[in-house]
Amino acid sequence: MKLDIVLIMFVTFSTTLAQHDEREEWYPFRFGNGHVGCSNRLGMSENDFCRKLCNQDGKWRNSKCKEHYCYCGPQRFYRVIKL
């Protein structure tokens, strides 16, 4: 009986976590009045550059580059700074 409950909970949570990225809302990264593109002159890949832009305020966010524009997800975790 306990094993059945644990199994049901495991399947429910793993399914929820697996589908989480699909339901996540993505927001375009904006600077001024424009939408920021992923291309850069720093020699970084588009995904790395987009990640750097989305996380510049010290908060963990998912990021993605879609159609050469940068999109940021909602805040995940605060960064922990080790001294």
UniProtKB/Swiss-Prot annotation:
Keyword terms: Disulfide bond, Ion channel impairing toxin, Neurotoxin, Potassium channel impairing toxin, Secreted, Signal, Toxin, Voltage-gated potassium channel impairing toxin
Post-translational modification: Contains 3 disulfide bonds.
GO terms assigned for molecular function: potassium channel regulator activity; toxin activity
Species of origin: Tityus serrulatus (Brazilian scorpion)
GO cellular component: extracellular region
UniProt keyword Signal present: yes
Localization terms from the record: Secreted
Position of the signal peptide: 1-18
Function statement: Reversibly inhibits potassium channels.
Protein name as it appears in the record: Putative potassium channel toxin Ts20
